[in-house]
């Protein structure tokens, strides 16, 4: 059984498991390793070197878990890219759960039935929900929302609301996805980088209704922070191919009973230990 499928079992189990304690902890988010992008699918050697350094950092910091918010590979049909990404994940300590979510490149842009089926064969799941220390963490397949895969998206929406309803006694509800709901403004027009406005409004209203505090996303390949009322969207830079001014790096998120605190660190600026 592969490393990622092992954690699928954990994810399913944790949907129904609750935790009484509220001790602070931290997790790591990284996004868009996109194996193959740097050399236009001719090689992924540069991504491998970067991700091996990231693994060393993760193993040293020993976070509660790691979330990779999509675009694991540049070409979702390139088995070599997929295999290398999965190999890198196996280098992370076995006691650190690793959760992944699909990006548009993983599903070949259109999120067809075939691409979703292939993704599920490789990773075992395309969304997740678990509780840890009285906080609820939910990961969505955002490419199917973007691509308007109506039937699949509706099923996911029902699943999402059910899990939000079941988490009302939690201190926090935190969402993960590849696409941010919007890039600059909640009412901005549809574009490649955001969720279409018709669907966007549904999800933003749901975030408000169930008091979701944070979303951590990727896709843009640069860092940004946006808000919709009390709902905060944090977009994290690509770990391998930044398109903005920030260095490649990771986001460390500290979860306290009464607040969420997060910082982005360039790969050469990450502290050797984290103080809570």
Could you describe each region identified by the protein language model?
Residues 1-22:
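Bacterial Sec-dependent N-terminal signal peptides
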Residues 17-82:
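N-terminal active-site segment of His-dependent metallophosphoesterases
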Residues 27, 66, 137, 173-174:
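Hydrophobic beta-strand anchors of alpha/beta hydrolase catalytic cores
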Residues 32, 70-71, 103-104, 140, ...:
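Active-site glycine-centered loops adjacent to acidic/histidine catalytic or metal-binding residues
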Residues 37-41, 72-76, 143-151, 186-191:
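Surface-exposed cleft-lining segments at the edges of enzyme active sites
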Residues 79-172, 193, 197-214, 225-263:
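Extended active-site neighborhood of metal-dependent phosphoesterases/phosphodiesterases
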Residues 167-185:
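Short acidic, glycine-rich surface-loop motifs adjacent to enzyme active sites
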Residues 257-276:
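Acidic, His/Gly-rich catalytic cores of divalent-metal-dependent hydrolytic chemistry
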């Amino acid at each position: 059984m592969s490393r990622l499928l092992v954690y699928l079992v954990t994810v399913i189990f944790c949907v129904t498991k609750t935790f009484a304690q509220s001790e602070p902890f931290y997790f790591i988010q990284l996004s868009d390793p996109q194996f193959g992008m740097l050399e236009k699918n001719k090689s992924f050697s540069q991504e491998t070197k970067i991700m091996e350094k990231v693994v060393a950092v993760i193993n040293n910091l020993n976070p509660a878990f790691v979330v990779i918010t999509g675009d694991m590979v540049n070409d979702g049909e390139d088995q070599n890219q997929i295999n290398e990404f999965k190999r890198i994940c196996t280098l992370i300590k076995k006691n650190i759960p690793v959760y992944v979510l699909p990006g548009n490149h993983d599903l070949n842009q259109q999120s067809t039935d075939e691409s979703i089926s292939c993704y599920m064969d490789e990773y075992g799941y395309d969304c997740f929900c678990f509780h840890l220390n009285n906080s609820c963490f939910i990961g969505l397949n955002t490419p199917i929302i973007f691509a308007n895969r109506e039937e699949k998206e509706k099923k996911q929406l029902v699943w999402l609301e059910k899990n939000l309803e079941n988490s009302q006694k939690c201190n926090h509800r935190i969402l993960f996805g590849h696409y941010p709901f919007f890039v600059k403004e909640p009412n901005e027009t549809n574009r490649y980088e955001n969720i279409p406005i018709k669907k966007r409004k549904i999800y933003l209203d749901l975030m408000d209704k169930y008091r979701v505090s944070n979303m951590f996303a990727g896709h843009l390949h640069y860092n940004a922070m946006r808000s919709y009322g009390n709902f905060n969207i944090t977009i994290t830079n690509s770990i391998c191919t930044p398109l903005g001014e920030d260095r490649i790096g990771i986001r460390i998120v500290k979860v306290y009973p009464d607040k969420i605190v997060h910082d982005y660190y360039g790969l050469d600026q990450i502290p050797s230990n984290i103080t809570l």
